[in-house]
C-alpha cells in the first residue's frame, strides 16, 4: 500500500506561477486595443494570444484560470463591472487551447511548423467555441441581450482573436520554444 502523504496534491508550482504571470500580463495589456468601431464593446486585443500561450505551454487548467482571472480583473479595473458571459468564454477558450499542450512541445524547445499548425487549428476551434457559441448564448441567457447584436459581437471577437493569436501567439510560441533551456528555477525547495 502506498503512502498517500508522499503523493503530490494540487497544481504544480510552475503552473500556479504561470497562471499568475499570465493573468498579470493580460491585465497589463488589457487596454492595449484597437476598437472595432462598427461593433459595440468589441476590440482587437492581444489577450487571446497570451491566454493561448499559457494554455499551450502549461495545459488546460492554466489556460482556464489565466482566462478567468485576467478577464475578471481586467473588467473590474478598466470597465467598472464584470461581464460574466465573456469571462466564462475566456475560461473555456483557455481550457480548449490547453488541450494540445503535450503535442506542441513548446517547453521542450520542439515547437516547429507541424506544432504551429496544430496550435492554430486548435486556437481557431477554441475561438469558435468561445465566441460563436459560449459568449453569445450566455449573453442572451444572463443579460437578455438581443441575439443579433451578440452574435455579431461573437463573430467579430472570433475573427479578431483568431487573427491576433495566429500572428502574435504563434510568434510567442516559437520564441518561447527557442529560448527554453529545459531547466527552470521554479523548483520546490526541500
Task: For every predicted segment, state its role.
Residues 1-190:
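Loop-helix junctions at membrane interfaces
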Amino acid at each position: 500500500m502506498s503512502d498517500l502523504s508522499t503523493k503530490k496534491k494540487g497544481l504544480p508550482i510552475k503552473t500556479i506561477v504561470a497562471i499568475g504571470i499570465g493573468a498579470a500580463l493580460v491585465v497589463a495589456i488589457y487596454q492595449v486595443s484597437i476598437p472595432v468601431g462598427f461593433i459595440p464593446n468589441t476590440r482587437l486585443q492581444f489577450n487571446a494570444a497570451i491566454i493561448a500561450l499559457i494554455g499551450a505551454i502549461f495545459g488546460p487548467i492554466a489556460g482556464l484560470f489565466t482566462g478567468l482571472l485576467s478577464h475578471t480583473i481586467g473588467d473590474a479595473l478598466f470597465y467598472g463591472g464584470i461581464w460574466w458571459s465573456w469571462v466564462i468564454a475566456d475560461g473555456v477558450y483557455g481550457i480548449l487551447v490547453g488541450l494540445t499542450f503535450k503535442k506542441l512541445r513548446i517547453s521542450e524547445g520542439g515547437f516547429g511548423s507541424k506544432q504551429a499548425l496544430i496550435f492554430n487549428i486548435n486556437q481557431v476551434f477554441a475561438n469558435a467555441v468561445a465566441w460563436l457559441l459560449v459568449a453569445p448564448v450566455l449573453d442572451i441567457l444572463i443579460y437578455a441581450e438581443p441575439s443579433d447584436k451578440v452574435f455579431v459581437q461573437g463573430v467579430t471577437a472570433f475573427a479578431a482573436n483568431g487573427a491576433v493569436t495566429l500572428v502574435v501567439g504563434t510568434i510567442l510560441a516559437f520564441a518561447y520554444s527557442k529560448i527554453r533551456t529545459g531547466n527552470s528555477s521554479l523548483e520546490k525547495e526541500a
